[in-house]
């Protein structure tokens, strides 16, 4: 019997790490409630604020879309960026390091599984938001909309971090314009926030879903944002690879695979 090739091991690892996240969501049905109904409460708060000040109805759509994309940012922070730190605390990180497979394959499997599980929450928020608040959308270009969405996810899931999760959660909600057009911060501030992929992704998707209102609030042209997202995707994936290699080398040289006293 022949040994599996390098690529076979890679894709088996991806499927093995994606499986628990997809199946776990189905086995724990309460997660579906907490991940779909409860996030609508925060979305509803912003919707009622906009309606109280008699903002244009498109702003309700901005909030619903931002609330749905919040699911992906939180998944990146707590199910990706902090994952290896938690694995270190539970004693599993050393098993990942010595396993005869790629750490990138492990993270890719985690990302794919997380995307599938998180997409259920995001679709539920969008569907319920559209039905409850009667949001009207006008899709300008479906291929561009899908391209922006996929590139935003690719760039987001290329990011890695540890204890920065708490530090980044709320500030990113502000500077990325989750609940308002990022151009409202000013062009310079929006340009600085563009290093965060979801900033460009949200602005582009809003332009494609609410073209009339976004004509006066758009940051830059959608095609420019698509190109920037493609560059960010490649850049963050390269940085993730370098960070993983550095972490692996440091852990082996200095013995940091486990916490002290474990």
Locate predicted features:
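Hydrophobic transmembrane alpha-helices and immediately adjacent juxtamembrane helices
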Residues: 1-262
């Amino acid at each position: 019997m022949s040994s599996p090739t390098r690529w076979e091991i890679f894709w088996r690892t991806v499927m093995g790490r994606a499986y628990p996240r997809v199946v776990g969501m189905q086995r724990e049905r309460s997660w579906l409630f907490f991940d779909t109904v409860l996030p609508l409460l925060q979305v509803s708060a912003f919707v009622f604020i906009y309606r109280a000040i008699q903002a244009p109805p498109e702003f309700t759509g901005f909030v619903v879309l931002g609330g749905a994309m919040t699911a992906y940012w939180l998944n990146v922070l707590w199910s990706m960026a902090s994952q290896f730190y938690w694995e270190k605390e539970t004693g599993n990180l050393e098993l990942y390091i010595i396993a005869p497979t790629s750490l990138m394959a492990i993270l890719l499997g985690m990302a794919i599984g997380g995307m599938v599980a998180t997409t259920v929450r995001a679709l539920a928020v969008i569907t319920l938001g559209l039905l409850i608040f009667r949001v009207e959308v006008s899709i300008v270009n479906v291929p561009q909309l899908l391209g922006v969405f996929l590139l935003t996810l690719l760039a987001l899931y290329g990011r890695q971090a540890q204890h920065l999760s708490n530090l980044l959660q709320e500030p990113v909600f502000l500077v990325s314009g989750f609940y308002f057009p990022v151009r409202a911060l000013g062009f310079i501030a929006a340009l600085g926030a563009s290093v965060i992929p979801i900033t460009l992704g949200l602005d582009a998707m809003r332009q494609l879903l609410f073209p009339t209102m976004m004509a006066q609030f758009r940051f830059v042209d959608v095609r420019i944002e698509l190109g920037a997202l493609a560059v960010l995707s490649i850049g963050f994936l390269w940085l993730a690879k370098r960070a993983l290699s550095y972490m692996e080398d440091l852990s082996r040289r200095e013995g940091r695979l486990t916490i002290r006293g474990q």
